[in-house]
Each structure stands twice: as structure tokens, then as C-alpha cells.
A protein has these predicted regions:
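Conserved catalytic core of nucleotide-sugar-dependent glycosyltransferases
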Residues: 118-172
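Active-site-proximal specificity loops/subdomain of glycosyltransferases
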Residues: 40-43, 49-94
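GT-A fold catalytic core of metal-dependent nucleotide-sugar glycosyltransferases
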Residues: 81-133, 152-153
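Membrane-proximal basic amphipathic "stem/tether" segments
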Residues: 283-320
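N-proximal low-complexity "stem/linker" segments adjacent to membrane-targeting elements
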Residues: 1-17
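Low-complexity, glycine/alanine/valine/leucine- and proline-rich hydrophobic stretches
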Residues: 225, 231-281
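Catalytic core and acceptor-binding pocket of nucleotide-sugar-dependent glycosyltransferases
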Residues: 158-243, 248
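Short, acidic, metal-binding catalytic loop of nucleotide-sugar glycosyltransferases
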Residues: 21-29
Length: 320
């Protein structure tokens, strides 16, 4: 299994926690990490990590034509979005014998083996996962039907054609703006099922559970396995976490009116946050701002969130 991700020094703890979770599954894998600054490359190199191959940002920008030009006309987050397909392309260029490459967001955590997902994908040239929005989060469909958290490309004609299209689209336009057919690097995926016949939409609900779909499921624990609707959790996408101080984190589950208790609290969020916290030291998570709130929403939504957070008590204190 060949996975890839990319991040800078601010997300090193995320990347290390992702790596640890993959190691815990005991699968045979390589995690290809594109280091988005020199500090990250030097830091990770000193750790001599197993199952990891590191790439420098300079090499990425030298190998992918148009990347440096794109860097000049978008902000840092938008540039990182642009580098999602570029990272995949660069790895396949440097490792032509790889059968497939799977892009992962760095804030994922595996609770069981990803083999079950690859068993479902089989010989598909492309594999993507839906957000599976709950009705409360359905309005977020404007950001895309599919989530970039997991994207697989087989190193065949159709897989490379899809990857090349994604790269071309992102180099041309990749901004934090919601438009009819595009948003960042993500909404481009919506057109892929119609364009690529050998594309697989992953059915396993244990893949990419997250705050936007968490209310769809009944969470339980059986034989130390975390289940959602009796299906084993493969990986959880820990988006929207906010570090309050060195030991306290806001899960922001109140945004979707989800109580933080039971299996979800003790076996999902606490497990992840303890591991993440161990990799942080004195650093803090940089919380992404709400870039898309305007007008009355910009005033009312923060008030709503404070009230719902008070009611649902979605803060985890790791000292307790």
C-alpha cells in the first residue's frame, strides 16, 4: 500500500499521529510525505521514521510545471490545496513501479486496517469517498459531494488521466471560494464519476467518518472494535478540532448537535487527542478560520456555536 500526504511544520503532529495509526494496523505500507517547508524535511529526517519516504518542496515545485506560478497568485492554504494532486503526480513520476497511490489528509486516524477498503476498490482506476452528509450538515454540499480525505489513483491510463485532469484544474483555479462547479481542490471531484468509467465510490461507511456525518450512525463497541451501525470504523477524519490549551480540546461536535459521550468520546476522540497531544509538545493547533461567513451569518453563527457548545459540552480535558 502506498499512501501520500503533505504538510508544513504546523501540521507535523498530525502527520506523525497519522503515521502511528497506520503502523498500529500492521499493514505493509509506505507513507510518502511531501514536506512543505525545509524545517519539516529536516525534522522528520532526524526521526528516521519507518515506512516513510520524504520529499522536499523544492523538488515538487521543480518537477511539476506551473506550480511556482500558481504559488504567486493564491494564499498559503490555497497553495496547499493546489499541491494535493501535485503531490500524487510527483510521487508517481519518481516511483513509476508503484501500482497505485492514495492521497490522505494528514488529520486522519486509522482505527483498523485499510485493507478492507482496498478489497472494495479492487482494480478500480480511481476511488473516492462521499461526505455522506447528515441532514444537519447537508448545506455543506456546496463544498462538494466528495471529500479529499481519501483519493486513490491506480497507475494505469484512466487513473493517470484523472490525476492529470485534477492537477490541471487545480493549477488553473484553486481558491477558498465557493462557485457553482468548484471549491478549492475538492469540488472538482464531483464531475469524475461521469468522466471515468472505472471509478469506484467507496461504500464502506467505516471510511471517512467525520463531524459532518457522525450523526448518521449509532456508535458502539464490541470486542474492542469501534462500530458505526455495526460496521467497523476504519478511519476517522478529525476536522474542526480546536486546541484551547495544552490539555484541553474543543471537538466542535456541538456544531452538528452531537453529544460528546460514550464510545465517540472515550474510544474515538480521546484516543486520537491523547496521541496527537503526545506529538505536539508545546505547540498549538492552528485553527482554520471561517473564511466563508459573510453578512448576518458572520454575526449570528458564532453566537449559535457558543450556545450549542455550552449545551452539548464538547470540550475534552485530557487530564480527566
Amino acid at each position: 500500500m502506498n499512501f501520500c500526504t503533505h504538510f508544513d511544520k504546523n501540521y507535523i503532529p498530525y502527520g506523525l499521529t497519522l503515521l502511528e495509526s497506520l503502523n498500529n494496523t500492521a499493514v505493509d505500507f509506505t507513507l510518502h510525505i511531501t514536506c512543505m517547508d525545509n524545517y519539516t524535511f529536516d525534522y522528520l529526517s532526524k526521526l528516521k521514521l519507518s515506512n516513510v519516504k520524504l520529499y522536499k518542496i523544492h523538488d515538487l515545485e521543480s518537477n511539476i510545471e506551473g506550480l511556482r506560478t500558481a504559488k504567486k497568485n493564491r494564499n498559503k492554504v490555497e497553495y496547499f490545496f493546489t499541491c494535493s494532486p501535485a503531490t500524487c503526480k510527483n510521487i508517481l513520476m519518481k516511483n513509476p513501479n508503484i501500482t497505485s497511490i492514495t492521497y490522505l489528509d494528514s488529520d486522519l486516524y486509522f482505527f483498523s486496517s485499510p485493507k478492507v477498503i482496498f478489497d472494495e476498490i479492487k482494480e478500480s482506476s480511481v476511488a473516492i469517498v462521499e461526505h455522506r452528509f447528515h441532514w444537519i450538515t447537508k448545506r455543506q454540499i456546496k463544498y462538494g459531494r466528495f471529500n479529499v480525505g481519501w483519493v486513490t489513483f491506480r497507475n494505469d491510463k484512466e487513473g493517470n488521466s484523472c490525476l492529470d485532469l485534477w492537477l490541471k484544474d487545480c493549477l488553473n483555479w484553486c481558491y477558498q471560494k465557493v462557485e457553482k462547479d468548484r471549491f478549492g481542490d475538492q469540488k472538482y471531484l464531483d464531475k469524475w464519476p461521469k468522466l471515468f468509467k472505472n471509478l469506484k465510490i467507496i461504500d464502506n461507511i467505516g471510511a471517512n467518518a467525520a463531524i459532518w456525518n457522525v450523526k448518521n450512525y449509532k456508535w458502539s463497541l464490541k470486542d474492542d472494535k469501534i462500530l458505526l451501525n455495526n460496521i467497523p470504523l476504519v478511519f476517522y477524519h478529525f476536522a474542526n478540532i480546536h486546541q484551547i490549551d495544552s490539555q484541553r480540546y474543543n471537538t466542535n461536535l456541538s456544531r452538528v448537535l452531537m453529544p460528546l459521550n460514550g464510545v465517540l468520546k472515550n474510544n474515538v476522540y480521546k484516543v486520537y487527542l491523547n496521541n496527537l497531544n503526545n506529538n505536539f509538545g508545546s505547540n498549538k493547533i492552528l485553527f482554520k478560520k471561517d473564511n466563508h461567513l459573510h453578512g448576518i451569518k458572520k454575526l449570528l453563527i458564532p453566537i449559535y456555536r457558543k450556545i450549542s457548545s455550552f449545551i452539548f459540552k464538547d470540550i475534552i480535558d485530557l487530564r480527566l
